[in-house]
């Protein structure tokens, strides 16, 4: 039976998560910064539709990318070499989330609701949630956002308005994280898109153990600035 969380409840052990649907661990609780940091540090993330209660997940296996295993296709390399774009970080976090929330061709809705945008924007103000943005001709054309704790980046969502724009942001993110000493990027669930970039599945138990070694709780994060950016 899936437990319902109150505002002060602890998450149940990961091994109690359901097999089907894969990884459903708990229901309820809140999206406060404290709760979200507690969740991510244990390998748990919220994912639910508008009108539903908050659902908390820890799937097995877990899709991850180790920065050294990044794969860049020839077509993506060509897009990167063009250099007709600018990468910015943490400049437009909430607009990136709203762009990720926009309906896609293959769906009419999104799980990124206003309450999620509000919650992650609060994490962003604390320096734990970050956006990586691809700009062309002064317009935001792609990007991604996620949560950084210790030496792990937890990817949440991506969007593209022009071909390869989100992948360009992702490649720059991975290369910068490797320079900063990050060792793992959480991609949550398997997709062909992520697999093409080098992500692979590992057992939840291994993922959990790696988190214990790599995630360090900090009272406050910091705004990101990639090596090529000018500090303002």
Curated annotation (Swiss-Prot):
Q: Where mainly found?
A: cytoplasm
Question: What is the stated purpose of this protein?
Answer: Functions in the N-end rule pathway of protein degradation where it conjugates Leu, Phe and, less efficiently, Met from aminoacyl-tRNAs to the N-termini of proteins containing an N-terminal arginine or lysine.
InterPro entries given for it?
Acyl_CoA_acyltransferase, Leu/Phe-tRNA_Trfase, Leu/Phe-tRNA_Trfase_C, Leu/Phe-tRNA_Trfase_N
Full protein name = Leucyl/phenylalanyl-tRNA--protein transferase
What processes does the entry annotate via GO biological process terms? protein catabolic process
- Any idea which UniProt keywords this protein has? Acyltransferase, Cytoplasm, Transferase
Q: Which domain of life is it from?
A: Bacteria
Q: Which GO terms describe its cellular component?
A: cytoplasm
Compartments where located: Cytoplasm
Catalyzed reactions per annotation: N-terminal L-lysyl-[protein] + L-leucyl-tRNA(Leu) = N-terminal L-leucyl-L-lysyl-[protein] + tRNA(Leu) + H(+); N-terminal L-arginyl-[protein] + L-leucyl-tRNA(Leu) = N-terminal L-leucyl-L-arginyl-[protein] + tRNA(Leu) + H(+); L-phenylalanyl-tRNA(Phe) + an N-terminal L-alpha-aminoacyl-[protein] = an N-terminal L-phenylalanyl-L-alpha-aminoacyl-[protein] + tRNA(Phe)
Q: What is its EC number?
A: 2.3.2.6
Q: Which GO terms describe its molecular function?
A: leucyl-tRNA--protein transferase activity
The entry assigns this protein to a family as follows: Belongs to the L/F-transferase family.
Upper classification of the organism: Bacteria, Pseudomonadati, Pseudomonadota, Betaproteobacteria, Nitrosomonadales
